[in-house]
Swiss-Prot record:
Name of the molecule in the record: Ion-translocating oxidoreductase complex subunit E
Annotated family: Belongs to the NqrDE/RnfAE family.
Organism of origin: Salmonella typhimurium (strain LT2 / SGSC1412 / ATCC 700720)
Mode of membrane association: Multi-pass membrane protein
Subcellular localization(s) per the UniProt record: Cell inner membrane
EC number: 7.-.-.-
Length: 230
């Protein structure tokens, strides 16, 4: 149970692929102009990570070490192709919006890195959990950044949610404030860099506060020879 908890905590927070490892920055900065786009690509990446880790782990005993990386890339490309066809079939609006960034998941360092560092050494179910946790950690970071940029840029949240979830999701659109001219800095790549920098700073402050709190609540060490004294 402790290993499962550690995998989840590492993926979601301590070893977050976007906020700690700073991997996959190209889609993170390019696609997060809206919360819907960020959530769509994040969930697609999570599905790819989970299925890839599961497959790599299941085949690890029969994968020659000398050619393991090309085999990993072939597995990732197959999974990404299947996910791309699913999005094309069931969320065509999102498919058009994400464009080239769906097939580019193949080259994402997160996917190859987890296959090599974890799935090639652990069992299938732990590997699937690792892929899911890492993917949800990245999805969370992308969603927060996309939400901030959409609110600051357009004054809305979940605009275009119907392209991801279907026609009923139009009711999810929220207008935070009305604006006739979008705040372009928030919508363009410089705004994404600034937003990511602020998120990194907030995570650092939270980590430091948690570290300080643990140090204050930790029991002080008892000097040797003092335990028997009254």
């Amino acid at each position: 149970m402790s290993e499962i908890k550690d995998i989840v905590v590492q993926g979601l927070w301590k070893n977050n692929s976007a906020l700690v490892q700073l991997l996959g920055l190209c889609p993170l900065l390019a696609v997060t102009s809206t919360a819907t786009n960020a959530l769509g690509l994040g969930l697609a990446t999570t599905l790819v990570l989970t299925l890839t880790n599961l497959t790599v782990s299941a085949l690890r005993r029969w994968t020659p070490a000398e050619i393991r990386i090309p085999i990993y890339v072939m597995i990732i490309a197959s999974v990404v192709s299947a996910v791309q066809m699913l999005i094309n079939a069931y969320a065509f609006g999102l498919y058009q919006s994400l464009g080239i960034f769906i097939p580019l998941i193949v080259t994402n360092c997160i996917v190859v890195g987890r296959a090599e560092a974890f799935a090639a050494k652990k069992g299938p179910w732990l590997s699937a959990l690792d892929g899911f946790s890492i993917g949800m950690g990245a999805t969370g970071a992308m969603f927060v950044l996309g939400s901030l940029r959409e609110i600051l840029g357009n004054g809305t949240l979940f605009d275009g949610a119907d392209s991801l979830l279907g026609g009923w999701a139009k009711v999810l659109r929220v207008e935070i404030f009305h604006t006739d001219s979008p705040f372009l800095l928030a919508m363009l790549p410089p705004g994404a860099f600034i937003g990511l920098g602020l998120m990194l700073a907030v995570k650092y402050l939270i980590d430091e506060k948690m570290k300080k709190r643990r140090a204050e609540t930790a029991p002080s060490a008892v000097p040797a020879g003092e335990t028997g004294k009254v």
